[in-house]
Amino acid sequence: MKLFVPALLSLGALGLCLAAPRKNVRWCTISQPEWFKCRRWQWRMKKLGAPSITCVRRAFALECIRAIAEKKADAVTLDGGMVFEAGRDPYKLRPVAAEIYGTKESPQTHYYAVAVVKKGSNFQLDQLQGRKSCHTGLGRSAGWIIPMGILRPYLSWTESLEPLQGAVAKFFSASCVPCIDRQAYPNLCQLCKGEGENQCACSSREPYFGYSGAFKCLQDGAGDVAFVKETTVFENLPEKADRDQYELLCLNNSRAPVDAFKECHLAQVPSHAVVARSVDGKEDLIWKLLSKAQEKFGKNKSRSFQLFGSPPGQRDLLFKDSALGFLRIPSKVDSALYLGSRYLTTLKNLRETAEEVKARYTRVVWCAVGPEEQKKCQQWSQQSGQNVTCATASTTDDCIVLVLKGEADALNLDGGYIYTAGKCGLVPVLAENRKSSKHSSLDCVLRPTEGYLAVAVVKKANEGLTWNSLKDKKSCHTAVDRTAGWNIPMGLIVNQTGSCAFDEFFSQSCAPGADPKSRLCALCAGDDQGLDKCVPNSKEKYYGYTGAFRCLAEDVGDVAFVKNDTVWENTNGESTADWAKNLNREDFRLLCLDGTRKPVTEAQSCHLAVAPNHAVVSRSDRAAHVKQVLLHQQALFGKNGKNCPDKFCLFKSETKNLLFNDNTECLAKLGGRPTYEEYLGTEYVTAIANLKKCSTSPLLEACAFLTR
């Protein structure tokens, strides 16, 4: 980070010694009024002795994005559409702070995109063709991306023949779309009011630019409809009698009063956000600056300078006037995760051909964790005729993120990860079902899931080892945050010891996903070359059920936390792997919570807990389609599928338990549409919630922000 010597405040200060260097944030502005406000902010912050700010001037938002990427500026506030652009190559900026709207009692990090019309104008949303339109600016959320995404079916747009702007120019009789190329699309600048070169400008030099500008375009009678945000009418017309002259167009082709925006809007849009570089981005310094600024100059804090206010005749300089403050965005959240899958889908719909959009909706993108799962997924994709395609990530958390972004649709998860995915807004779709002795006559797909037994396994020869003497022993875990391998045993241990120091109970462990430098990774081996040690995927030799049991079988650890089936699947000749083919079931014992030990045949009376079955999760808007496709896929490639084993088997792996557990008989339907809490059960959810009090994860922190 660069240090600088602040300029002396006045000539009278020349006799003073130079001040100590202070860290500086270079704020990017896109107009003369913004630059003047920034300079006033700069002066106020100097008086506080807080983080210093200097003001950088550029012509429009994209130039600010470039300046930040090139380290010629550090921060700027952007609308969601520009947050998306900023996050793309080559800029790779990320949002670091979100504006907060609403009220102090009910703060929100989103706003509503609305279509405003004058009362008495006789048309609905599906009758906009041939009308005159007012937009905040090209590429902006409420003014362009959302309405064009909704109007796309009416645009007669042939993607291969012309850009979207050309279709919009033909759809409306005239428009004002600031930031557009007025030479290429004169019709989209026809209503704009700027003079000369300023007509259609991407700043307040165009009077109809931005939210208030687009509404003024409607007020002045230039346009028939203004695409703005829900607060625009209230900010420009404080009197109810004046507001009553306007209405909102609703998606169901009705109209509503302007104060009914929660029921009548085009979309819910993420807040404007401050963006910075994702590497060397001065995030902490920017947040320190914003925190101090909102503390001193936020709503109703100061008469001399208002951070969320603009001079008469101006609106939304630097920040939206309607903002109440800022909320820091967790480091795990990039631009795509911040905007969310629905917003990103709208963007994709405007960038892809109709055929591409249809193909994206038809297929299911499965997320594979690690290279071995990716290999199996690609085989599945090929055999499915591309009805299933593959995305891949190195960790389960990263796969969950891909589903949240809409870059993948589904994956199969252990109960611990179902908890995380549920906290992030994903829903269970289908559950793994094993053979049942209780309901053997029922169709597997319709049979209730019974859960599985989480157990602690030790060598029979290690005679003195019981549940009560595990302290300072060596442990083998499937992975951090997984049910049988982590959540259940560590939850029990935390309850017994009252300590959250996970890495102090056992002398050494292999818990893939833990800090590689900690004791919890000391026993992990990585791949055949010793690389990727302790990663939570199949590159780590001791990852997963089979890996944790192997860690015990090879005398690396004293105890393995797995499921009951794991012992049976890897002993008495059930596995052909070199390390397992000579293992005898009788050589292992289960640890019971009462301090006794029992043979592995007695798991029903000697286990740590009954765990919920693994289940497929997806976004709620894709759940029904994912379910339909998977049921068809298992009819082809399931245990009794017509193409298994000849072509491909979903529930069979070259190693163990790739994509699905190998002992899965079928993917079963769930009764109704259960939430993740209903699927996991209150007892299990409570246990994990208590465990998470010890240590949360970056993904859970991110999702707590995204779902607030």
Swiss-Prot record:
UniProt organism field: Bos taurus
Control of this protein's activity: Inhibited by PMSF and Pefabloc.
InterPro entries, per the entry: Lactotransferrin, Transferrin, Transferrin-like_dom, Transferrin_Fe_BS
Cysteine pairings via disulfide bonds: 28-64, 38-55, 134-217, 176-192, 189-200, 250-264, 367-399, 377-390, 424-703, 444-666, 476-551, 500-694, 510-524, 521-534, 592-606, 644-649
GO CC annotations, alphabetized: early endosome; extracellular space; plasma membrane; recycling endosome; specific granule
Post-translational modification note: Poly-N-acetyllactosaminic carbohydrate moiety seems to be needed for TLR4 activation.
List of residues binding Fe(3+) 2: 414, 452, 545, 614
Protein name per the record: Lactotransferrin
Superkingdom classification of source: Eukaryota
Catalytic residues in the record: 92, 278
Temperature-dependent activity: Optimum temperature is 25 degrees Celsius.
Binding site for hydrogencarbonate 1: 136, 140, 142-143
One function term, GO molecular function aspect: cysteine-type endopeptidase inhibitor activity
Gene3D superfamilies: Periplasmic binding protein-like II
Functional summary from the UniProt entry: Transferrins are iron binding transport proteins which can bind two Fe(3+) ions in association with the binding of an anion, usually bicarbonate.
Record lineage: Eukaryota, Metazoa, Chordata, Craniata, Vertebrata
